[in-house]
Design a protein with these regions (language model features):
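Surface-exposed interaction/gating patches
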Residues: 12-24, 112-190, 228-250
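The conserved glycine-aromatic submotif of the RRM
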Residues: 53-62, 175-181
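Extreme N-terminus of proteins, especially the signal/transit-peptide cleavage junction
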Residues: 1-8, 126-128
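Residues that flank catalytic or metal-binding motifs in active/ligand-binding sites
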Residues: 9-11, 59, 103, 131-133, ...
């Protein structure tokens, strides 16, 4: 768990990829965008992942960006939107390149549970996974923070038995405290499979789902895989020196 309360906020993105451009898009975001954002906006890359298409819509990428609280996010919004085009003019070439790889996206602003580790803490702890479970919960209005506390006290011990580690727990901002996103690191594909196989037969898992149902109206889980420059794979932030590690198409 985090040693200090996490006061960051996060931008979460589901990105719809055009054709066979997922690898191109992931490199464009990590190597070509993140180093700029780190300097100009104090924004860190928490993660860029590809979704496992068997478990969700495809082709798709999930981005998660760490902002320096709402004050930092407000400053970033000013930097981006206080222009006639509603885009930073200095990034026009970057935007033009990005649109070759992705069609559209759906974003959320997330507020972390205070005990959720920042990306720098996760990297310092050596957290990684062969895959990750991304869970999206729709809750009774007003119960997001109660649900996160239930996850902390009851859910974590259940999933840890299968080797799953909770690395992100977030409530969605700008709505009625009715949505939560959880992110679990899973060391091996087999540990994911073992947990899924036990969903109806393991008494602790069955009880945990019963407890969740007291607050959750519905939820869905998909799997993610690190992009090559994802900090949870490399243990560091993407840098300009990474730009030559992958050749984008002309």
């Amino acid at each position: 768990m985090a040693s200090m309360a996490n006061e960051k906020v996060y931008i979460h993105e589901f990105i719809d990829i055009i054709g066979h451009n997922r690898a191109n898009y992931m490199h464009h975001m990590t190597a070509n965008w993140s180093p700029i954002a780190q300097v100009e906006r104090q924004q860190l890359c928490y993660g860029v992942w590809g979704t496992v298409g068997t478990t969700r819509r495809w082709p798709e990428v999930v981005n998660l960006w760490e902002e320096d609280g709402f004050e930092g996010l407000a400053s970033s919004f000013r930097h981006e939107f206080n222009h006639p085009t509603l885009q930073d003019p200095a990034l026009s070439a970057w935007w033009a390149r990005a649109q070759q790889f992705r069609r559209a996206g759906v974003d959320r602003v997330l507020v972390p549970a205070p005990w959720t580790r920042t990306i720098e803490e996760l990297c310092a702890d050596g957290v990684t996974g062969e895959t990750y479970a991304h869970e999206l919960f729709q809750l009774r209005p007003g119960t997001a923070w109660e649900f996160l506390e239930l996850v902390r006290t009851q859910g974590i011990p259940v999933l840890e038995r299968f080797g799953w580690q909770l690395i992100g727990a977030f409530a969605t901002a700008m709505r009625n405290d009715s949505e939560v996103i959880l992110l679990w690191s899973i060391p091996t594909w087999e540990q994911w499979g073992a947990c899924e196989a036990a969903q109806r037969g393991d008494s602790a898992l069955v009880e945990w789902k019963h407890q969740m149902s007291s607050l959750a109206l519905d939820w869905e889980r998909c799997l993610l895989v690190d992009s090559p420059l994802c900090p949870l794979r490399t243990g560091r932030q993407p840098s300009e020196s990474d730009r030559d590690s992958f050749q984008l198409p002309d």
